[in-house]
Regions:
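Core catalytic alpha/beta fold that binds nucleotide/phospho-ligands
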Residues: 1-161
């Protein structure tokens, strides 16, 4: 499988102007720096739901807040593009495991059940987000640093469903 994987990957730059079509048998991954311009920060704050705003304010001011805000900004914009709507029309709810899902029916069932997941990490001197999108099947992504001394077996048992 590893021999064919590289031939199936179609990496596109962040500057790519449009979202490619997402077919049922595809997985789209987006790796984005979690930083925003002042104008984007203002827009992102307006897009936050009450739950998201509370989570944003509970983070320490600075990098943690900026990364959270940028993550939600990019997530809402990507979801809007995949569902052919606007970022302010995307409504998220959260599962008991705190995983977000599309909660407004007109968006969540459009285009055959869009599924997504997001994680963030420190990469070199900047925080980055990894966003995953697919159709008709659940998806999950996570990034762990090799430098961290974690019990990955315990993490997997606790987090993987």
């Amino acid at each position: 499988m590893s021999e064919t994987l590289g031939t199936k990957l179609d990496w596109q730059s962040i500057e790519h102007p449009s979202i490619p079509d997402l077919e049922a048998d595809e997985l789209h991954l987006w790796w984005l720096p979690l930083s925003l311009s002042t104008q984007q920060q203002d827009e992102a704050l307006q897009l936050l739901s009450d739950i998201q705003r509370d989570r944003y304010l509970r983070r320490r001011a600075g990098d943690a807040q900026e990364a959270y805000l940028a993550g939600r900004y990019y997530l809402l914009h990507l979801l809007a593009a995949y569902t052919e709507t606007t970022p302010d029309a995307v409504q998220l709810s959260y599962s008991s495991m705190n995983k977000p899902f599309l909660s407004n029916k007109e968006v969540s069932h459009k285009e055959h059940d869009l599924q997504f997941n997001f994680t963030d990490t420190q990469h070199q001197a900047q925080r980055h987000g990894l966003f995953a999108f697919c159709r008709q099947r659940e998806v999950g992504v996570d990034i762990e640093s090799y430098a961290r001394k974690n019990n990955f077996t315990a993490i997997a048992a606790d987090r993987f469903t």
